[in-house]
């Protein structure tokens, strides 16, 4: 029985679990949306919520506390300048966990953990990627057309 066994051990020792959660939390704050297993998402949620609450305070002490937990200075800057102001009027509940199927290798349940209100930024990223992809495709087609035209203009057996 699991009476009074709070928290998630994730099949790791203490330092490995702490490193995993720090990496996951940093990735969530930098990317707005991360796919992971459902258990890791549930384990990371309270850490992200606490950091966003620190970001809403915005004082130097809070910034230093966040810097002690997060992996990069860029993540701290993004937390305090971009993510935390998004939730100025909200008291908690900054994340959403959406189940997304099962992992192929071991059948673990996968989920997206995402920051609420990040849909616009995610859509902009997706749109930029689609535009870049279309531009690359257009350049490739142009290069292929030029290559075919150059090949078609030369007489056969020109190497002899």
Swiss-Prot record:
The keyword NADP does not apply. Residues 123-141 have a biased composition (Basic and acidic residues). GO terms for cellular component: cytosolic large ribosomal subunit. Residues 142-152 have a biased composition (Low complexity). InterPro entries: Ribosomal_bL17 (IPR000456), Ribosomal_bL17_sf (IPR036373). Gene3D superfamilies: Ribosomal protein L17 (3.90.1030.10). It holds the Pfam family Ribosomal_L17. One of its GO terms (biological process) is translation. One of its GO terms (molecular function) is structural constituent of ribosome. PANTHER family: LARGE RIBOSOMAL SUBUNIT PROTEIN BL17M (PTHR14413:SF16), RIBOSOMAL PROTEIN L17 (PTHR14413). Part of the 50S ribosomal subunit. Contacts protein L32. NCBIfam families: L17. This is Large ribosomal subunit protein bL17.
């Amino acid at each position: 029985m699991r009476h009074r066994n709070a928290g998630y051990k994730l099949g790791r020792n203490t330092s490995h679990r702490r490193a995993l959660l720090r990496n996951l939390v940093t990735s969530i704050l930098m990317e707005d949306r991360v796919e992971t297993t459902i258990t890791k998402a549930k384990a990371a949620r309270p850490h992200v919520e606490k950091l966003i609450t620190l970001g809403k305070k915005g004082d130097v002490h809070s910034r230093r506390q966040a810097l002690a937990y997060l992996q990069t200075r860029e993540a701290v800057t993004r937390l305090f300048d971009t993510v935390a102001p998004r939730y100025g009027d909200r008291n908690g509940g900054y994340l959403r966990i959406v189940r997304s199927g099962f992992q192929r290798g071991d059948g673990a349940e996968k989920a997206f953990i995402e920051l609420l209100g990040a849909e616009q930024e995610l859509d902009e990223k997706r749109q930029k990627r689609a535009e870049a992809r279309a531009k690359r495709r257009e350049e490739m087609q142009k290069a292929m057309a030029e290559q075919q035209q150059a090949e078609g203009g030369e007489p056969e057996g020109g190497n002899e």
